[in-house]
Amino acid sequence: MFQQFNISRSGFGTYQKMMFNITNNISNAQTPGYKQTRVELATLFPIILQEAEVKYAEDEDLNPYIKKKRGIELGTGVRIEAISTDFSEGNLQVTKNELDVSVRGEGFFQFRKPDGEIVYSRAGNLARDVDGNIISQSGYVLDPPVRIPNNTTKLTIDPEGRVFANVNNEAIPREIGQILLARFSNPDGLKNVGNNFYQETIDSGEPLVEVPGRNAAGQVVQYSIENSNVDIIKEMMDMIMTQKGLELLGKAMQAGEAMLKAGMGMT
């Protein structure tokens, strides 16, 4: 009875976390550069009830049958092993904003937080602060920094990340900065720190900072943003299945609790 209740409880808690992950993906379906996440499950360590000898053929010429000890196992539930990120590229959406930039390749934009920490993102819906610095939507300054001069009438970002500004309607633009991209040998090892940002880890390896258009970092495309890669139809179907699982596990927990109370003489 205890085992049945514990298995149902572990499953219910796991399905709740799966539901949270699904709703988070759905809520970010329109977030530029967002990468969907997936919950990876694993079984809890089973209980060995007893051992049995099983005969199986190995080498019929030398030894036709070998006896092998084999345990009879009882499952104990399920757990979340990891939450992985799908870094596949989202579709490109054309815009009319000169500070919208997408990456066609493996690279990440680099941003510096107020505390000096560097974080990485695929979201290229950039903005400009009061000092003219190019920033993320969260206010983090692009790294290396690029400052847009006052009275800039036109801003151009080429595929190699060079930033040009026409000031006071000048005919010839001036180069004011360079956007660099970071890529990782193992992007799956990046740590998701929220708000569409990632941190490097030992597993991700150190960033390889490159000029766009070289190697695998990819080019930058102005007047465009990368849409999220969330498959909204799949997420909705997963939500329905997960909700059904929660309902069944909830009933199993109630039945297990009733059996426990009956066994203990409780009403």
Role assignments for model-derived ranges:
Residues 1-267:
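Amphipathic alpha-helical polymerization modules
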